Amino acid sequence: LKFQIVIHIAAFNGLLLGLSWTEIGFPPLIFVAFIPLLLVEKYISDSGPNTSWNLFGCSFLTFFSSRSYTSWKVFGYSFITFLIFNITTTYWVWHASPAGSFAAFVINALLMSFAFVLFHKVKKVLGDKRGYFALIFFWISMEYLHLHWELAWPWLTLGNVFATVPDIVQWYEYTGVLGGSLWVLILNILL
């Protein structure tokens, strides 16, 4: 795929995630919203060099090495996706603090992209099945962290996409909103 096409896919993916959110959105879109980014990751993974030796040992250093350029591609495309997602869903923060909203957009996109790159690295080493399990683990871990630290940002937890249709998520009383995130991720991976 050409660079421009992949950039457009990443941007479309961010809009797809954003369109599934809030009052104006269509929540069922979330069940397919990660598929374009997963396909981009698969394309990059299949076309790049095998960097499986990088995960263990000195993973931090090798993440930034030239042999691991596929990680940078995954990071770049996922960052575009998640930045657009953050802007389309929490644009209203701009009215309170332009500088604060810019920081929130970028930090949230970085955290989401980091979870996605970790998934990419594990998938390269351990294969597809374990890699997709790692995606669920890293994403839920990132959301859990994001709910429990000083810079908590609960709005974009994937399970919150159903805030406008609480009738279909009554089971959240048992699993919490992270159960909804798990549901969203599993369906995106299976589809």
Model-assigned labels for residue ranges:
Residues 1-191:
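Membrane-embedded alpha-helical bundles of multi-pass enzymes
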